[in-house]
């Protein structure tokens, strides 16, 4: 940027000067102004631009105001630079003209500035002189002179003047810099002729800056209301020093953002004036740091004050200092405690509050307990209750509401003696002496009239004679006389309460005490406590009921007195069912009012009195309130006493380690850690970097560690329970890892490969894999522990599966959940000569639990086992046997296996029979199916599917095969044994059955091709074909009954 670009002096807003002579005006060349000599300012000739193309009706340039390029002077500085006034002196006085060669060269940042309902466009001489606007420049407008002229002709002059002043005010802030320096035209060399000025104009602009102390023009216009937009005023109005700050003005120039320094966010100051910093020390101290400036070399002044001295005048601190706590039997004498309680009782009497008398009674009870080392007798308590009763009230009998005998509103008749007058029917009044009354009672007894004698004695109030006589009669009569006697007493009479209690009833005073009409409750409690005869539990319930009644009337201290007499245990604040939490305080109110200092002190005195008798009287739920009291002591500056409380609480927690709460332990250690420096013993023994701790605090830390370890150990059973399924999951994962190897052999004839089955999945079950090969392996080959099938015989899907799965079924029924219906719709039967294997075999010989044609000895054993069921079961008809076999085959074809009991209908492939449902009826449980022959049993040795459903072997039913099952019955037992391994179930499948029954058993590895199978003698049929066809296996029928679907 060239340094010779001039700056235009600020225009004057004062009164317009007189017209300048024509000789002093500059020449006119092509519509451009030339500088003409003007007045001197500071010894320098200043040129002034004038318009020599003045028209008869001069037009105002509405954009001229915004194009003022330099400083915005203040109102007080307009008259200081009169020689630099650049008003147009020709034409109308005071009307401004634009200078198109300089001011209109670069328009304002906003091209069409709206004011009111009109828009003011650019200067008309741009298009008239043929200047080509720059492409993409924001400083170019495309308005013609015709539009500008049309707009100017229809605008009043006064409005143009007002807008010029407003627009100059609003945009001088943004355009006070030199447009030749900031605009893009100066760098591209596109300045027009006549735009070169002397350098003296720049120096004049620097010397003509107004005073900083004057008020901003924007502020003045805002005050007088000349601003057209308050929003624009807020955008451009700044303080006076910022108006002439080049750094602040640089923020408004249209330059790239990277050239503008961006101020980072600054956090506001927390304090704007110097202040005192305050903190609390560990020994109940208040530490104050006075304000200072360390950068100026000032030393900070630290003041240490004692909170105990500052808060010495508070009533709460005085109350805490007067209490001799912590109350430890070895450290505090009971005389001091009794003195404190007596003072509190006297204060409660003088208070005059409604509960003051009951509060004083509680403090007196604590004095009595402290005097008697925590023990109390009924007579002592009765004496305490009757101390405040100066004179006993005279209890008057109220008018009877109803007779207790016949519930009639009648009273005893008037006493009279003498015969009734037969004429008038009246009885003459007669006054009889007590001797005459007793004589009449005796005369009636002479003649054996006991009932009349009782009535006479009751009418004449001879209750002693009546009670004695009725006691020797029947019990009903005695109760009648007793009721008559008690009805003569007042309801609020303590004698009435005692007699009702001795009669085995809850006195009416227990539910009515506390009313103003009833009277004082103390004599009733005194008579109950003094007379211990009767049922102790009834007496306790009466006292508790009386306390509940008093508590419902708002008499908390009186209710708690009754609870102490009934030995009600202390509870917790959050449990509404607990009657006692703090002595003399109801836990139905807010906690600050509930946990008052007086209530805590009262309860601590009670705890101290209980420990005086040598008995463990610590209240476990009260220790947290003692900790709260200790923290309050620390707040009031009594740090040493608070630390002693921590020691007492720690001792109590260690003595009740089983019932201590972990949160209480943590908070106690935390508070003791803060207050341990308040103990002089700790300060004396403190040495080195490590602070010495008392023994009880160290024991608390060890107890906390033990609690944390115990909590971690308590979580181990849960983790052990989680590990147990983990072990099972390991076994199952091994099983699932071998699953793809088994699925390779699912391409057997008539079967479809399928993933792990779901209860709704249908299809043919995949038989166990069999590897074709020689019957025996090579010589010297190791014999595996698991039997390996060498030959796989194609088995139809309609064949029944091996009966050896009954052991699986037995295991499934054993491990099933209670109430779960696990029974299969098939009835599992075995031939008579087959041996039932009820326990899984060893892992070393994991043969399948299938049927075997055993020797006659085993047949006898089976007969002996099933002989006890002979009279309970009836033989099934052969017709039902065939139907059962059809249903079994249909269940096998359904592909559900173990899940077949979920289905109520067979699949589409199953043969439909009208009598098919009869096998599932309850009547079918008494019928036995036809046992198959060994030839048919050999066909039943086909391996059950493993991959379709894990419990499929348990769902195998032994029944007569039909159709293709009989057509393939020519297979010998040796071929069957060689083809199916051991019992029709290979080693892995038998192991999987054990896995189901015993999850801890690991799954055996896959079978090895060419291995020699183990010999199982039980698979060799030794039973004739006709054996077992007539008698069912009743033991199997008993174990596996048929359940309806």
UniProtKB/Swiss-Prot annotation:
GO biological process: endoplasmic reticulum to Golgi vesicle-mediated transport; Golgi organization; peroxisome organization; protein localization to endoplasmic reticulum exit site; protein transport
Compositionally biased intervals (Pro residues): 1-13, 942-953
Ranges for region Central conserved domain (CCD): 267-711
Function: Plays a role in the organization of the endoplasmic reticulum exit sites (ERES), also known as transitional endoplasmic reticulum (tER). Required for secretory cargo traffic from the endoplasmic reticulum to the Golgi apparatus. Involved in peroxisome biogenesis. Regulates the transport of peroxisomal biogenesis factors PEX3 and PEX16 from the ER to peroxisomes.
Bias type Basic and acidic residues, positions: 22-33, 149-168
Biased segments, Low complexity type: 773-784
Residues modified as Phosphoserine: 55, 137, 186, 852, 858, 866-867
Record field: compositional bias (Polar residues): 50-60, 989-998
Bias (Gly residues): 957-966
Native source organism of the sequence: Oryctolagus cuniculus (Rabbit)
Recorded superkingdom: Eukaryota
GO cellular component: endoplasmic reticulum exit site; endoplasmic reticulum membrane; ER to Golgi transport vesicle membrane; Golgi membrane
Protein name: Protein transport protein Sec16B
Annotated gene: SEC16B
Composition-biased stretches (Acidic residues): 916-926
Keywords: Endoplasmic reticulum, ER-Golgi transport, Golgi apparatus, Membrane, Peroxisome biogenesis, Phosphoprotein, Protein transport, Transport
Subcellular location: Endoplasmic reticulum membrane; Golgi apparatus membrane
Chain segments carrying region Disordered: 1-78, 149-193, 707-733, 748-789, 813-1045
Entry keyword Protein transport: yes
